[in-house]
Amino acid sequence: MVMATTLFLLAGLAEIGGGYLIWLWLRDGKPVYLGLFGAVALALYGVIATFQAFPSFGRVYAAYGGVFIFLAVLWGWWIDGKAPDTYDWIGAVICLVGVGIMLWAPRP
């Protein structure tokens, strides 16, 4: 459980961070090297996800989607300075509950 959570967090940081760097380059006129670093981070995200121990690609990526939503809310708040509202938090927590059910519910 700790390894799965760690990998989801690392993948999220790589994906959101990479996307943010590309956003800064294309939308905010920042230097092209930020876009290149962003592309590398996005590629790294794809690699990190393969280290998950769960056997199903679909389950891993669907569960990661819930983690991504929660991390994106935090990123927007801490890095981009946009405070989430109550509904953002409720939605993000619902997603995390879904992740827990998908990954750790008892299966035959």
From Swiss-Prot:
Pfam families: UPF0060. Belongs to the UPF0060 family. The keyword Transport does not apply. The keyword Membrane applies. InterPro entries: UPF0060. The chain crosses the membrane at residues 6-26, 31-51, 60-80, 86-106. GO terms for cellular component: plasma membrane. It is a multi-pass membrane protein. It comes from Halalkalibacterium halodurans (strain ATCC BAA-125 / DSM 18197 / FERM 7344 / JCM 9153 / C-125). The lineage of its organism: Bacteria, Bacillati, Bacillota, Bacilli, Bacillales. It is found in: Cell membrane. This is UPF0060 membrane protein BH2744. Keywords: Cell membrane, Membrane, Transmembrane, Transmembrane helix.
